[in-house]
């Protein structure tokens, strides 16, 4: 992760599909490596990155301090963070917030359009319309795609046209069954655990999944689905 196989200074633009750190997390490294161009993302993605990239930088710096304390005692080499808070702050200044379905001219002959991917607040599929020799062709990069009928998030939308599609395939090797009733399922687990006097631990991604869990907890509480435990949650 420390060495990039290309020169960031040679990049003209960055197009970001969404804020999850496995997609956005190396942007400060690009800036630290010399990238000075604009970073295009939806408005919601930009706002989330204002939180997540600074948090990621803080974690990088904290880990470096911890490792260097150990290295100093053992005579090991100095550990340098992947990037710093200052790098993240510089990167955030290069973001350009964009709206869904409004084409943006990047340069002569190239425009970009963001379409709601239904994966996370602000997530998008990206369409690049490239005109050369009087012929326009459209390349669509799907980004991470969400399912339909999820709470809190819009359904994914299809780009209007495409000559070429580059698509993610996280669940491409399986068929999903009928969507479970998450409220009923979670209520049963909570009820059984509380009745035994136990505690419930639910590991969850901080951005996206945790908000859905809070939404389910709210439904369970408002509908008073947990019996005999008045202090839930």
What spans do the regions from the language model cover?
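Extended, well-ordered alpha-helical scaffold/bundle regions in very large, multi-domain proteins
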Residues: 232-233
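His/Asp/Glu-rich metal-coordinating catalytic cores
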Residues: 1-15, 20-24, 29-212, 218-227
């Amino acid at each position: 992760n420390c060495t990039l196989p290309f020169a960031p200074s040679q990049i003209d633009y960055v197009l970001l599909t969404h804020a999850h750190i496995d997609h956005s997390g190396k942007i400060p490294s690009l800036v630290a490596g010399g990238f000075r161009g604009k970073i295009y993302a939806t408005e919601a993605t930009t706002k989330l990155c204002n939180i997540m990239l600074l948090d990621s930088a803080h974690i990088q710096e904290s880990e470096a301090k911890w490792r260097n304390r150990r290295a100093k005692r053992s005579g090991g080499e100095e550990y340098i963070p992947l990037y710093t808070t200052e790098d993240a702050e510089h990167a955030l200044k290069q973001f350009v917030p964009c709206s869904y379905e409004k084409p943006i001219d990047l340069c002569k002959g190239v425009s970009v359009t963001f379409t709601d991917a239904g994966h996370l607040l602000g997530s998008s599929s990206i369409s690049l319309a490239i005109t050369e020799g009087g012929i326009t062709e459209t390349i669509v990069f799907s980004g991470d795609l969400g399912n339909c009928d999820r709470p809190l998030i819009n359904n994914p939308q299809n780009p209007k046209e495409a000559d070429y599609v580059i698509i993610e395939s996280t669940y491409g090797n399986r068929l999903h069954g009928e969507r479970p009733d998450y409220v009923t399922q979670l209520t049963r687990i909570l009820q059984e655990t509380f009745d035994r006097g136990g505690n419930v631990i639910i590991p969850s991604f901080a951005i996206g999944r945790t908000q859905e869990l809070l939404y389910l907890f709210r439904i369970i509480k408002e509908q008073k689905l947990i019996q005999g435990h008045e202090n839930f949650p």
